[in-house]
Amino acid sequence: MNLEAVKHAASLNEWSGLIPEIALGCLALLLLVVEMVLPKKRHDLIATIAIIGQFGILGWVAWDFHSPFLGRNDAFSGLLQFSYVGQAMRVFFLLSSIFVSILARVSLAKQQLPRIEFYHIVLVATAAMMLLAQANHFVLFFVALETLTVGLYILVSYFRTSPLSLEAGLKYLIMGALSSSLLLFGIVLLYGVAGNPALEGHTADPMNFAALTRFLALNPDNFLAAAGIVLVLSGIAFKIGAFPFQIWIPDVYQGAPTPTTAFLAVSSKAAGFAILLVLVNSVFGPYWWLVQPVLVAMAVATILFGNIAALTQHNVKRLIGLSGVSHAGFLLIGIIASHSVPSAVGAVLFYLFAYLLATFAVFGVMAHLAGADDAEQELDHYAGLAKEDPFLAAILAVALGSLAGIPPLAGFMGKLFVFIAAFKAGFYGLLAVAIVGVVISIYYYFGWIKAAFFETWTPPADAVNPRPARTPVGAAAGVALATLALCSILFGVYQGPLGAWLLAR
């Protein structure tokens, strides 16, 4: 994109389509300025400014949801495609960043660590994810993805005095570099093949999704293109935590700060699915003969591995990480079905929103029960929670029930919509595996609920009370947790216009 293209975009007022992303960047810079201006004892206001600013940007996206740019795939010289799915993901990522910021107020205070940089990185990473969901070009896709990834490298190792956090950061860095290498190598192969003048339909812009799709449709059996697609798919599989690229999840989820773990579990995973949804219905389409069996095998292995591995976990952060692997498998079913069933796109979006509500509620409870070293959170620590803090116990029960897919909660409806789409697409074997996965997941989710409601905490004989002291629930956190739980119930009982709109996408 050269200077003339920038001027052309300005003349068409295309920059106004990026107001939310630009506003997030400006808000991130504002936080740094406020840090220099405010006295140190007033730095607590910075978190409030960040949260209020994000609510303002969310309000703008909601007000401008039916943007005049919707449907265009040539914005910024073809880098961006504004769509309703992209708008929905904008809302998703803003909600995620708001809840992460609220969690950070609770969690970071225990470690006595700088907070301004945390909010700054979250804002920049959120802007990158919003661009990623609207990418129509591999250049923007890769730049946005790496901007997100670099921010996550820092956030994962944010507890610089914790060996587990530093270890998690190093593991995530190594695995992230590997996945980026696979992804970039795949993009290079596609770029080289589609720009080859000796092949039919070669294009001058082989990294544009639309141009690349047209080329691949004319060359549906090119070996190098097939290899490139598999490598790109492998790079994305790392982000969503799909088998066999989920190996980093348990250790990284345990060692990272709780707000960062929530950010990884929800936002980063959703960003991967957002771009995968675009690619499956564009670039990967002509090679569906290859992509479908790969995704089907990946979905089956992801569901079974995630659920079976979670059965043996006692650390709740590792448990929620491995259960998130199984949810990636369920979402892959929706992605596969979306190639032939249009309503599957809405089913995936609804599942993601239901997953957001339940997962952030669980992490909100975890943040209040964790001590200074929040990597050591065991199921035993939740024993007697219903008696000691009925509010947190109720939130936890609703959230885990939704993740397990228990009616009438939003998680149940999300799974139901995805399963219906898979049934319409004829993937009956996948449905059978998914049902087995749901049954297995009920065991460990309800084991967690059982500990909170039906067990009593008994300190071990070799320690007075190794269980960390619980943090009182503040007003902002209490409202956020109650909202998450109530919305999980509401969207399970009544989807209304929102559900109808999502399923019409």
Swiss-Prot record:
Its main location: membrane. Pfam families: Proton_antipo_M (PF00361). The keyword Lipid metabolism does not apply. Its EC number is 7.1.1.-. It comes from the Bacteria. InterPro entries: NADH-Q_OxRdtase_suN/2, ND/Mrp_TM. Coiled coil: none annotated. It is an enzyme of class 7 (translocase). GO terms for cellular component: plasma membrane. The chain crosses the membrane at residues 18-38, 45-65, 84-104, 116-136, 138-158, 173-193, 223-243, 271-291, 292-312, 319-339, 345-365, 391-411, 429-449, 473-493. GO terms for biological process: ATP synthesis coupled electron transport. It is a multi-pass membrane protein. It is found in: Cell inner membrane. One of its GO terms (molecular function) is NADH dehydrogenase (ubiquinone) activity. Keywords: Cell inner membrane, Cell membrane, Membrane, NAD, Quinone, Translocase, Transmembrane, Transmembrane helix, Transport, Ubiquinone. It catalyses: a quinone + NADH + 5 H(+)(in) = a quinol + NAD(+) + 4 H(+)(out). Belongs to the complex I subunit 2 family. NDH-1 is composed of 14 different subunits. Subunits NuoA, H, J, K, L, M, N constitute the membrane sector of the complex. HAMAP family: NDH1_NuoN_1 (MF_00445). NDH-1 shuttles electrons from NADH, via FMN and iron-sulfur (Fe-S) centers, to quinones in the respiratory chain. The immediate electron acceptor for the enzyme in this species is believed to be ubiquinone. Couples the redox reaction to proton translocation (for every two electrons transferred, four hydrogen ions are translocated across the cytoplasmic membrane), and thus conserves the redox energy in a proton gradient. This is NADH-quinone oxidoreductase subunit N 1.
